[in-house]
Amino acid sequence: KTKFSQNYENKNEIKYANSKHSNFPEPVRLFIDFLNSNTYLNFLQNLTSIQEELVADPQLNGGGLHEIKKGGVLKIHTDFNRHPTLNLDRRINILIYLNKNWKDQYGGHLELWDKSMTKCRKKILPIFNRMVIFSTNDFSYHGHPEPVSCPEGESRKSIALYYFSKGRPLSEIDYSKIKNKTYFEDRLGFKNETDGQSKGPKNFLRSFKFYKSIKNFEKKYLRRKKK
């Protein structure tokens, strides 16, 4: 057991999280250190066939230990796509479930949805010692939208780790989305299920390549002159 440092309670997510490495029990720290090691990074590189070099995040931004109690949810979403402090793109999510004797009727299935958010392609029960590795990009919708129905005193627990690279394929980018934002989306047939991100005029412009070119020019030349 460990003390959780963050409590999320809103329409999109009801969960606890702790990303402070020093708060974890020693076995958890050692396990996370291994998953962030060069040995494991090489394994991931070969497994995923990602061309860009994968980089671990020892800061555990958004990762670490997660816990969801009875009634908790994590609505379908795409993750933030950039590291908050490093110039890196997010590429891979790893989830390790810690739920002994977890039953199907407890729910909490990880759902992987298609790019158009019209169909759930895969449901994964969060049973003990199960690891899920999946690509994270601007179209990789996932979550567990149905409230967990485990008994009182039980909870859905997991370790979450994220891996990054410098650059990513254009096919993984949705220019209408703001960098470093989590986007929650309603499932087909569920109206106002989430508090989604606003898509105003600026976001609309981001869908055009000329807008991206202008912004890159601004960053490269105009902002540099101001410094």
Regions of interest found by a model, annotated:
Residues 51-62, 106:
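A short coil-to-beta-strand element that immediately follows conserved catalytic motifs
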